[in-house]
Regions:
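S-adenosyl-L-methionine-dependent methyltransferase catalytic core, i.e., the SAM/SAH-binding region
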Residues: 1-146
Length: 146
């Protein structure tokens, strides 16, 4: 969906409220490619769910709270299912903030609240994905509080 498509959606919304799933589908259907319609609609509904439930704010709050509730040596294990979540979690675990910028002390030493337990993200095996197709997008990250 390009910016002109989005502006058309916004203008249409100004004239007619979106009150049902049918209204929403009618509005976005012209922008879905026939071969990618299912994927496009899944992403659109995922975006709606994330926004309506304020999931990114909730994830940020939870991660920030771990700094107070975890004792040194305590482990934080997080499974993410899409790139927005994963980027937040990855940056937070590696740097202690959501932007991914490391804090340094007076001497230039990087200050991070966590140590990554695994250097690489853990993803499901081919066998797991075959048994459970919904696991295909899952990423597991483990960090230990310093």
């Amino acid at each position: 969906v390009c910016s002109s498509d989005l502006s058309l959606i916004v203008r249409t919304r100004e004239n007619k409220k979106i009150e049902t799933i049918g209204d929403f589908l009618e509005l976005v259907k012209p922008f879905t490619g026939k071969d990618k319609e299912k994927k496009f609609l899944a992403q659109a509904f995922q975006a709606l769910r994330i926004e309506v439930n304020d999931e990114m704010r909730a994830l940020k709050e939870m991660l920030q709270q771990t700094l107070q509730v975890l004792k040194p040596g305590g482990r934080l294990v997080v499974i993410t299912y899409h790139s927005l979540e994963d980027r937040l979690v990855k940056n937070f675990l590696k740097t202690g903030n959501f932007e991914g910028k490391s804090e340094q002390d007076f001497f230039g030493n990087v200050q991070t609240p966590f140590r990554m337990v695994n250097n690489k993200v853990i993803v499901p095996s081919d066998e797991e994905i075959e048994r459970n197709p919904r696991s295909r997008s899952a990423k597991l990250r483990i960090a230990e509080k310093k």
